[in-house]
Amino acid sequence: MNGMNGMNSMTPATHLLLVIATPLIGAVVAWVLGSRGLSAVRQSAAVTALITLFNAGWLVLRYLQSPEAAAGEPYAVASAPWLVGGIFDVRLSLGLDGLSIWLFGLSALLSLTAVLVSWNAIREKPVGFYVLLLLLEAAMLGVFAARDVILFYVFFEFTLVPLFFLIGIWGHEERRRAAVKFFIYTLTGSVLAFLGLLTIVLWNASHTGTVTFDIASLTAGTAAHPLPMNAEGGWLQMIVFLALFAGFAVKVPIVPFHTWLPLAHVEAPTGGSVDLAGVLLKIGIYGFLRFSMPMLPDATAAAAPWLFGLGAVGIIYGALVALVQTDLKRLIAYSSVSHMGYIVMGLFALETVAVQGANLQLINHGLSAAGLFALVGMIYERFHTRSIANLGGIATKAPWLTVFFMLFTFSSIGLPGLNGFVGEFLILAGSFQRAWTGVAPALRTPYLVMAVSAVAGVVLGAWYMLWAVERVFFGGSREPPRQAGVTHGHDAHGYSAHGHDAPAGHDGRCDLEWYEVAAVLPLAVFVLWIGLTPATFLAPPAAMLRAATRAATTAFDAQMRDLDDRAPTTPAAHVADRVVGHGHPAPRQSFTLTSKPNPDTELTLDRP
């Protein structure tokens, strides 16, 4: 109790700094303890991740109870001058708000999961592994807490370094190729994104006379002095949008910029896959919400139909490729491509309900995908294969592993009552709403086709996931072929041999160890919690989501009206004019659903 009172007396800004500093300190401690052996290193990493999670969770609770949460304002802001004087007003700033709060907490949660799933899987060079894992945690927390462009970019770039080495050193047979491909793709995109952000900074300085990297100041500045979106201005806003798109689309990844992801997932160690799927893919969507949509609304509106379509393509493409996979981990990797397509589609529907669903689905996918990747790693540790054809009957040998895998599978396919259903439902509802009443008649059919394809993706997702579950867990029991000739810590199939044979009982059971249950149980709790009380998780970001997307949504609606005004008039259109009114899209009446017991959560549905 005294400890909690002490944390409550700590200023929120100090509390935030403590959360981010803890994994950095823990990385140093793990390095120092390296001489004491594997047990000391992994225990120190687990304690560090647990302390970070506790502090992050407490900070999230403090935010939810703060007046800033209700007002949609920044919380726990810590700022220090870096370059102040003359025309420069550059301050390094950290803070949390509705856009970042859940992703911040998710980063801390999945970092503990990543440490625990690596408990017996990593035996070669454990000091370097756990140091890099903790550095990656600090970088992920920093990305979502950064309130200025410089810190955001530093943390954004720094996430690449630990993951590059985690894949390249502790990965599987093609680990080096996967690491290099991952690094080149993401580094190229992030450099272009930084050039785009720097252009925004310079544009703002040319109008205000002050060079600032503060994100809130840049958002206000671009609202007062928008970047030109016309030929006279060189289409500067669209050029900057494309530069940011290059960095964020690769990070998501949006098809066709996804080719690095399946290879990186398959070759990464389990802990790396947990962080990659659970958190790092979300940074791209966060970047769109934090920078592209509020600072470049006209370009966002112009690109929205194309990105809505790319989201639909990603849904179907990822699902179809997942259907033909024979490697369980690769199947889940392509399912991530499909699920991120839903998030992209919901975000660029520019409809309140869809955007709220997309934001919630960031958390949902982080939980379910991280859980599935963690469990696939546990399966490999026991059976030394990920081949679906060589697995079967696991339910009789590892019933708790089966229960958790089925729970995360049902979450992934959107079973009602679980978290995945809520996010997908809101995305689909908002997408159909946009397609039916929110676009010009010329675009209505393409939008409806894309929305219907998203529904087809739900069916395909259930197909490939349930197909895999049936064969791996309930098919005939098969003994996977044992491979001889392990070299350089990898077996003949290229799978890491850093793991162990899980002890089996006299009946052949090889169920989860305590640390494996501890790794996935918190994720399962949140899967159920969000599914049963979604309003609890929809309320905190609602105000910030409206603020972040308002300008882009307004610009998109204006573009739709302009497109309809320029459409050729037909006799049928004259009839429609009498019913609808002057050739414009149907006037949109709105009604609000207020979720109880959280009246702050409003889902606004429009109707003709």
Give each language-model segment a name:
Residues 11-22, 96-107, 149-162, 237-248, ...:
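Structural signature of hydrophobic alpha-helical transmembrane segments
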Residues 27-32, 57, 112-116, 138-142, ...:
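Alpha-helical transmembrane segments of multipass membrane proteins
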